[in-house]
């Protein structure tokens, strides 16, 4: 293979992730790479909540079109932005090692969620984060917050919010860890499916490329991500519902924690299950939670 072209979004975080993959391909597979950057609809439409304009797939479509039209060979994504169902013909070819999966509390005035005064304004665009925050602190005011990490931090620094919630992984990767005031415990805010994992997307038919990319695959990331995504797929969850799932691997045993909540945080269901087959584990936990009324909670 002469060269691999990688499709990427233009944000600093997207380019960090893409360059991370590029460097691994070049150093470990000895294949030269080039990056092709592009704006996605998710980057352009910033004045509306994601769940109102089409969901997470808006961050991927242009990259997938580039692959289909032979302008790129692979695309690099944050796994938490990847819907549970990919377009026909695409697959997840490689999972990178997971960064810290927790949500980050970022504030210039307060040290933690517990320190926030009644009525404090917290920014997040995630229904999952909003629901869990309101469940923990129903006296907070949650306002929508879109844009890349730098844009969101600027809005906080300008005084638009008392605090904002971001993914710790993105701040760590951009060397902004000093902005994290509190790593939010998973008991308070269970992460999004796949949070902290960078993933490579490719065409299923490209066997030669898939075989090469597979050599970069992190087995632990792949197994925990498969469990989390199987749970999400069984529930048919997207960014229009408050769903969280986080798996940990110990030897060959996977512990999967999951949460569904009403958008106002008043109703919440949390469960945990242990198993060694990630797909089966995710499905079984979802089925258990469906039997306990998960859909009724999500619909409310």
From Swiss-Prot:
EC top class named in words: transferase
Cofactor note: Binds 1 dipyrromethane group covalently.
Cofactor (UniProt): dipyrromethane
BP terms from Gene Ontology: protoporphyrinogen IX biosynthetic process
EC number(s) on file: 2.5.1.61
Cellular component GO terms held in the UniProt record: cytoplasm
Keywords for this protein: Porphyrin biosynthesis, Transferase
CDD domains: PBP2_EcHMBS_like (cd13646)
Pathway: Porphyrin-containing compound metabolism; protoporphyrin-IX biosynthesis; coproporphyrinogen-III from 5-aminolevulinate: step 2/4
Residue numbers carrying S-(dipyrrolylmethanemethyl)cysteine: 239
A Pfam family reported for this protein in Swiss-Prot or TrEMBL: Porphobil_deam
Example GO molecular function: hydroxymethylbilane synthase activity
Reaction(s) catalysed (UniProt annotation): 4 porphobilinogen + H2O = hydroxymethylbilane + 4 NH4(+)
Keyword Nucleotide-binding: no
Family: Belongs to the HMBS family.
Primary role: Tetrapolymerization of the monopyrrole PBG into the hydroxymethylbilane pre-uroporphyrinogen in several discrete steps.
HAMAP family from the UniProt entry: Porphobil_deam
Note: The porphobilinogen subunits are added to the dipyrromethane group.
SUBUNIT field: Monomer.
Protein name in the entry: Porphobilinogen deaminase
Record gene name: hemC
């Amino acid at each position: 293979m002469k060269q691999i072209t990688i499709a990427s979004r233009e944000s600093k975080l997207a380019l960090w992730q893409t360059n991370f993959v590029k460097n691994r391909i070049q150093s470990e597979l000895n294949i030269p790479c080039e990056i092709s950057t592009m704006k996605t609809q998710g980057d352009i439409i910033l004045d509306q909540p994601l769940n109102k304009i089409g969901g997470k797939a808006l961050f991927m479509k242009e990259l997938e079109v580039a692959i289909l039209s032979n302008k790129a060979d692979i695309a690099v994504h944050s796994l938490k932005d990847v819907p549970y169902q990919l377009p026909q013909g695409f697959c997840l070819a490689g999972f990178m090692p997971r960064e810290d999966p927790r949500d980050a509390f970022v504030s210039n005035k307060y040290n933690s969620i517990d320190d926030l005064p009644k009525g404090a304004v917290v920014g997040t665009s995630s229904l999952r984060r909003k629901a869990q925050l309101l469940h923990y602190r129903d006296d907070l005011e949650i306002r929508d917050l879109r844009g890349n990490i730098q844009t969101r931090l600027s809005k906080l620094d300008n005084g638009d919010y008392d605090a904002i919630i971001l993914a710790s992984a993105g701040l760590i990767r951009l060397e902004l860890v000093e902005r994290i005031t509190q790593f939010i415990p998973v008991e308070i805010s269970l992460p999004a499916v796949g949070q902290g994992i960078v993933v490579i997307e490719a065409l299923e038919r490209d066997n030669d490329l898939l075989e090469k990319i597979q050599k970069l695959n992190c087995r632990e990331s792949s197994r925990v991500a498969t469990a989390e995504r199987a749970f999400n797929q069984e529930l048919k969850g997207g960014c229009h519902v408050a769903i969280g799932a986080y798996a940990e691997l110990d030897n060959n045993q996977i512990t999967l924690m999951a949460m569904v909540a009403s958008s106002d945080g008043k109703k919440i269901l949390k469960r945990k299950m242990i198993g060694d087959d990630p797909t089966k584990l995710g499905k079984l936990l979802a089925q258990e939670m469906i039997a306990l009324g998960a859909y009724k909670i999500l619909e409310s």
